[in-house]
Amino acid sequence: MSTTVRQFSSSTSLKGLGGGSSRLSCGRAAGYQAPSVHGGSSSYSVSSRIVSGLGAGYGGGYCSSVGGGLGGGFGASYGAGYGAGFGGGFGAGFGGGFGGGDGILPAGEKETMQNLNDRLAAYLDKVRALEEANTDLEVKIREWYKKQGPGPERDYSPYYRTIEELRSKILAATVENANIVLQIDNARLAADDFRTKFETEQALRLSVEADINGLRRVLDELTLSRADLEMQIENLKEELAYLKKNHEEEMNALRGQVGGEISVEMDAAPGIDLTKILAEMREQYESLAEKNRRDAEQWFFSKTEELNREVAVNTEQLQSGKTEITELRRTIQSLEIDLQSQLSTKAALEGTLADTEARYGTQLAQLQALITSVEEQLAELRCDMERQNHEYRVLLDVKCRLEQEIATYRRLLEGEDAHISSQYSSAMSSHSGRDAITTSRQVRTIVEEVQDGKVVSSREQMALTTR
């Protein structure tokens, strides 16, 4: 809080009716400082001068100037004349006061403010000139368009049909190319499938040939075994024939021996019946030969059946193995075809994935750039808003200060009007009463308490001295 003390002193001298002069001087000392826009401080002072005279009329003038570090100034002038009538005026302007007052700005700051005012005026003049030039150009453009008028439009309808035909041909060619590409891809896949089938069939053929070669070796072994068995059968037959022949020879020999013997009858114990013995021996040999034949036939048939069973079992196993191998090869072929199709699908999906990733990467980069630009614009807008808010607060502060100063000056002017009227009436009464020279001095002291740019309290003291 700061306290402002204003002191007004006035002196009056009166003479005769022929002429006279009255002087009122007012001095103000104010200690007030307020923060400026750039963090500094500004101060102001008020100086005023009133000159009045009596003669054919009474006139007075008042002028004051206010300047400050806020970048603006206030000036006012007041004048009154007595004769034809009484009138008053009040004016204000930025940049400094005019009249008989002393400015509160230093010489350098006054020149700076004047330069700024000149530059502002020149800028406004340029703006007006550019607006006028823009208006002239718009008028000229409208006139030119009016003079030119709408030209005759060409009829492009015949070309539209040609364009549609060409578009349809292009679309048909595109579809045909796509079909050809699809057929080429299908032919390539079919060729790959046929190549795979050929390789599979070739491998199957080689394996079948290998199996046939193995079966041929088995057949050769079986043929050799059969030949061996046939040779054994022949040997057994020869042995049987040889045994039969020996048996017949022995029988014939025994018969010859029996036929050539002399029969001698003796009265003795009965002898051995050789015929019976030979018959028994024949039966024994025949039974032995028959047994050997049956055994050989049984062994041959058993071996043959065993070999036939082995051949049948091996043939069944071979056939089942061939069937299983064929099914396995078909399964392998179908699995290879599925593998090729899956690999083709995988390659196509990988290509699509790469394209999609590239496309979305590009879109993401564009969105990121857009987000960055929007964030930059938002930051700039935020900075502009903060700057404008700061400027608004500063201007609002300046406006409040100027309104306070204007109110103060208005009170001062109202007080000066009252003083001038009282002095005029006292001068007229003094002139009518006596011609002696009377000097009076009136001291007016105003004490104001200002807190945060607002007047909290105001006190006024007046002192009058006459001599």
Curated annotation (Swiss-Prot):
The keyword Nucleus applies. InterPro entries: IF_conserved (IPR018039), IF_rod_dom (IPR039008), Keratin_I (IPR002957). It comes from the Eukaryota. It is found in: Cytoplasm; Nucleus. GO terms for cellular component: cytoplasm; cytoskeleton; keratin filament; nucleus. Residues 1-20 are annotated as: Disordered. Expressed in epidermis. Pfam families: Filament. Residues 255-277 are annotated as: Linker 12. One of its GO terms (biological process) is intermediate filament organization. Keywords: Coiled coil, Cytoplasm, Intermediate filament, Keratin, Nucleus. Residues 278-416 are annotated as: Coil 2. GO terms for molecular function: structural molecule activity. Residues 417-467 are annotated as: Tail. Residues 109-420 form the IF rod domain. Residues 163-254 are annotated as: Coil 1B. There are two types of cytoskeletal and microfibrillar keratin: I (acidic; 40-55 kDa) and II (neutral to basic; 56-70 kDa). Belongs to the intermediate filament family. Heterotetramer of two type I and two type II keratins. This is Keratin, type I cytoskeletal 14. It comes from Gallus gallus (Chicken).
